[in-house]
Amino acid sequence: MSYNRRSKNITQGVARSPNRSMYYALGYQKEDFDKPMIGIANGHSTITPCNAGLQRLSDAAVAAVKDAGANPQIFGTPTISDGMSMGTEGMKYSLVSREVIADCIETCVQGQWMDGVVVVGGCDKNMPGGMIALARINVPGIYVYGGTIRPGHWKGHDLTIVSSFEAVGEFTAGRMSQEDFEGVEKNACPTTGSCGGMYTANTMSSSFEALGMSLLYSSTMANPDQEKVDSAAESARVLVEAVKKDLKPRDIITKQSIENAVSVIMATGGSTNAVLHYLAIAHAAEIDWSIEDFERIRKRVPVICDLKPSGQYVATDLHAAGGIPQVMKLLLDAGLLHGDCMTITGRTLAEELKDVPSVPRADQKVIHPIDQALYKEGHLAILKGNLAEDGAVAKITGLKNPVITGPARVFDDEQSALAAILDDRIRAGDVVVLRYLGPQGGPGMPEMLAPTSAIIGKGLGESVGLITDGRFSGGTWGMVVGHVAPEAFVGGTIALVQEGDSITIDAHKLLLQLNVDDAELARRRVAWKQPAPRYTRGVLAKYAALARPANQGAVTG
């Protein structure tokens, strides 16, 4: 039986003789035209350490596809570095790159009639971009995560890239020496691999194990390790088998499997960006999913992993402690996962977890039993109020009291806010408002890691609030609320905030409120005028014209 269900459209028959001529130029033989064509979407790039170690994974996948009797077809996908673009205009391209990656994969797979695709990626937007594409095209696919970076070390302390961001605030506050500042800078990123805490890349890759679209244990392996190469090869072999079975993404990505993925995100203390990305993945798979679903899951799934940014450990520690399968086994035994969901292996999630211990190892402190959870409920809360009628996202772990009422300090761009923080013009009790940074207004919802890390570095993490219609890095923690919708650019209430207005953030009551009476807000609304778009040409202008609101995943199609 042949399994080239799709590629036969461009390899078979008299009319396709010119096509075969071109394949012969690539080294194909006559017998190859009856084999499935498997795409390898290779995100390798020397732009960022997140992607600089992907070539050997892609090479391993290519070899495994050949060994499995299929034809590998490698093509490139773009990336930008969220960490390097942070705090600059370049960060506006980050979320846009999610859409570009999805479109690139769709274009190549559909244009070339590939029978399946192995997606290999590393930096933050690579994961949702790839999964959006797989859900959209519904061609057999698997996700291979590039793996995490190893932690850095300086004077007995473990470091991640967030250590460098927070050091900026500490150094400018006089709380860190020049020697330590440079020591952190030089040692925070010692290897290739994605940022090491439960930040966005590790959040999304971990959730893909629960979603059923990546192999177990693959998300917490370190990029430099041989087991990561071996896992990439095994992923490719599994994908070829999925092609033979005609097992497609939408057989795996269901509302129940998304609930599994989000449950793991809650249990591990994952990134706020996961809210945006799973709205987009669900949209691509044509699944009914809303921000209210996140809140529903948050209320029943505890945080059981002590992971950075609000905890102590990093992804390599989680891997040594049993990885995501150990987390999932605890959740499954507690009735918090759907064990009957299909996975890319052709087995159910429960079958995949059958041999995982029911109790975490006693010699580790990363994964806690359910009855010893760090927090009884999840950490990604959906806040509403007159400042966010359509919702906003807050990360509420790591704080002694996630409640603040204080005067608004209003900024219409990130650079002005960062300067105010570093110049000590932001004080305890203030609520920083960063606006006109939403999907349309930014455009692209840039991440606010630079100002939030500066607040932490200044020692104000527990006493200063920050709200924005932009996003936060997975490395952010503190009294922060993002994804405010409606955004300022379309006239959301956040556009009406004035310097000194009283704002309340209350994560206990799930409230984000501007304490100004309705009559005054009505007067301000009449006077408000939409600003001119920041960009009128190029990819940012295209994105701004197409982007949906944050509460709909900020998708473009």
From Swiss-Prot:
User: What is the catalytic activity of this protein?
Assistant: (2R)-2,3-dihydroxy-3-methylbutanoate = 3-methyl-2-oxobutanoate + H2O; (2R,3R)-2,3-dihydroxy-3-methylpentanoate = (S)-3-methyl-2-oxopentanoate + H2O
Cofactor(s), names only, from the UniProt record: [2Fe-2S] cluster; Mg(2+)
- The keyword Zinc appears for this protein: no
Query: Main EC class of this protein?
Result: lyase
Q: Which domain of life is it from?
A: Bacteria
Q: Where does Mg(2+) bind?
A: 82, 124-125, 447
Metabolic or biological pathway: Amino-acid biosynthesis; L-isoleucine biosynthesis; L-isoleucine from 2-oxobutanoate: step 3/4; Amino-acid biosynthesis; L-valine biosynthesis; L-valine from pyruvate: step 3/4
Active site (catalytic residues): 473
Q: Where does [2Fe-2S] cluster bind?
A: 50, 123, 195
Task: State whether keyword tRNA-binding applies.
Answer: no
Question: Keywords of this protein's UniProt record, alphabetized?
Answer: 2Fe-2S, Amino-acid biosynthesis, Branched-chain amino acid biosynthesis, Iron, Iron-sulfur, Lyase, Magnesium, Metal-binding
Q: EC no.?
A: 4.2.1.9
Molecular-function GO terms, alphabetical:
2 iron, 2 sulfur cluster binding; dihydroxy-acid dehydratase activity; magnesium ion binding
InterPro entries, per the entry: DHAD_IlvD/Edd (IPR050165), Dihydro-acid_dehy_C (IPR042096), DihydroxyA_deHydtase (IPR004404), DiOHA_6PGluconate_deHydtase_CS (IPR020558), ILV_EDD_C (IPR056740), ILV_EDD_N (IPR000581), IlvD/EDD_N (IPR037237)
Chain positions with N6-carboxylysine modification: 125
Q: Which GO terms describe its biological process?
A: isoleucine biosynthetic process; L-valine biosynthetic process
The record's listing under PROSITE patterns reads: ILVD_EDD_1, ILVD_EDD_2
| Cofactor binding, note field | Binds 1 [2Fe-2S] cluster per subunit. This cluster acts as a Lewis acid cofactor.
Q: What does this protein do?
A: Functions in the biosynthesis of branched-chain amino acids. Catalyzes the dehydration of (2R,3R)-2,3-dihydroxy-3-methylpentanoate (2,3-dihydroxy-3-methylvalerate) into 2-oxo-3-methylpentanoate (2-oxo-3-methylvalerate) and of (2R)-2,3-dihydroxy-3-methylbutanoate (2,3-dihydroxyisovalerate) into 2-oxo-3-methylbutanoate (2-oxoisovalerate), the penultimate precursor to L-isoleucine and L-valine, respectively.
Instruction: Output the PANTHER family linked to this UniProt entry.
Output: DIHYDROXY-ACID DEHYDRATASE DAD (PTHR21000), DIHYDROXY-ACID DEHYDRATASE, MITOCHONDRIAL (PTHR21000:SF5)
Q: How does it assemble?
A: Homodimer.
Spell out the family assignment given in the record's similarity comment: Belongs to the IlvD/Edd family.
Record-given protein name:
Dihydroxy-acid dehydratase
Q: Which organism is it from?
A: Burkholderia pseudomallei (strain 1710b)
